[in-house]
Amino acid sequence: LDPARPEGTQIALHVVVIPALARQKQPDPVFFFAGGPGQSAVGLAGTAQMLMQRLAQRRDLVLIDQRGTGHSAPLQCDVPAPDEALARALDRSREVAALDACRAKLEKLPWGDLRFYTTTIAMADADAVRAALGAPQVDLVGISYGTRAALEYLRAYPQRVRRAVIDGVAPPDMVLPASDDVDAAAALDKLFADCAADKACAQAHPALAQRWQALLASLPRAVDVADPVTGQPTHVTMTSEAVRGLIHQPLYTPAQAAMLPYAIEEAAAGRFGVLLALASSIGDRPSDLSEGQHFSVVCSEDFPRLPAAPGPAGDTGAQGLYRAACAHWPRGAVPAAFYTIPVSPAPVLLLSGGLDPVTPPRHAERVARALGPKARSVVVANNGHGAMGIACMRDAVFRFVGAATDAEALAVDAGCAARMPRPPAFAPPLPARAVPATNDPDRFDDAPPGAPGADTPTPAAKDPR
């Protein structure tokens, strides 16, 4: 557990190696670093295989449950009961109390010294796995927080890296959650601007930005809603902090963000059901994320550098939550070098989505400059968080890793998704009109308005994409 005391408490790392399919495989395995922090790489095996299907033809795929996640000395908090999840999501004090109770429980575990779950220590574990596999070099693929892990591995073990792909770049000096608030505000402003510039969206949602500000100004407000998980009627208090937090996760995915104009209009009219359902329909289930590992990392690496007060972008509630939780969370030692990004001897491909609310291109572009001439930053303008979800980008990653030379890798064509449009704003279907009975043998009584044989066509509903 403590690298400085090898004779002390021992932990076991959960590692899965998915062998390459080819008979003559390449000697450099692909190490996949999951996001969060707190996700289990092994738990994402299906996703990892999908994202790297072509890479895995000729290279072993190595999935390591980072210490504190999955089955590697897990630091899992209790999952709230279905009828408690909404109350905790809307009330910071309940969430803080639950985290305090979780911390007390975790500290009683044999591996419960929460100081020893930092990214630096975890990457030493990863290099021990590399050595055990007998691989002179590895290729790295990191997503979201996994990009921070990959950058730390590259910093600490530069000669062990052949190629690196980091998607949704979260550099080590990016202070969570303060940067989240800045980037989420920018993504929301972009949504408002794009809606105003689109004729259909502007007609359906005029002055959307002003409606949003009016909504925030109208809060707090006590409302009756249907719990989006249980369906039971629930009385809750909606605060501006809670509403700002609810719109954050849908911004990750443009298809989900397309629902936000409608959800905001509904909330402004006092109907919060759409917004609550949208926020609960995506993202990780609580059981998928090791909250103990998450806070052990963030409280050690980010919290000491968190500004004393929220900046101009405000606080979605996360800053207050982390300040309260980290005030009592044990903090591990973080070397000063962790926050630096040296010039890379290995080619690095950095991927970003122009609509990403948490790791937008500004972070990748700064990291690429620091990494030097062997770094290449690619932005998919109308994508959100995670460019490798786009099939043609996965092909670009395959060609980058598989290229025979560094020069060929850095010259790979990665512009395939440049013309991908932003999904149009969601428009709810028009309500169906009753159709009177008829003796006309050429039509059915239940034919919809506008169907063949109908007496009077009506405008078709907008495509609800």
What are these regions (language model features)?
Residues 35, 267-269, 285-286, 386-388:
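Short alpha-helical linear motifs
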Residues 1-242, 296-465:
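Gly/Pro-rich cap/lid or specificity-loop segments adjacent to the active site
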Residues 251-265, 269, 304-309, 405:
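Short helix-capping/linker segments at secondary-structure and domain boundaries
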Residues 269-272, 373-375:
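Structural alpha-beta junctions
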Residues 264-265, 272-302:
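Long, low-complexity segments enriched in small/aliphatic residues
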Residues 227-245, 252-256, 284-292:
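Structural motif
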Residues 214-218, 253, 266-270, 281-285, ...:
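A short structural micro-motif
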Residues 128, 246, 262:
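Alpha-helical scaffold segments in soluble metabolic enzymes
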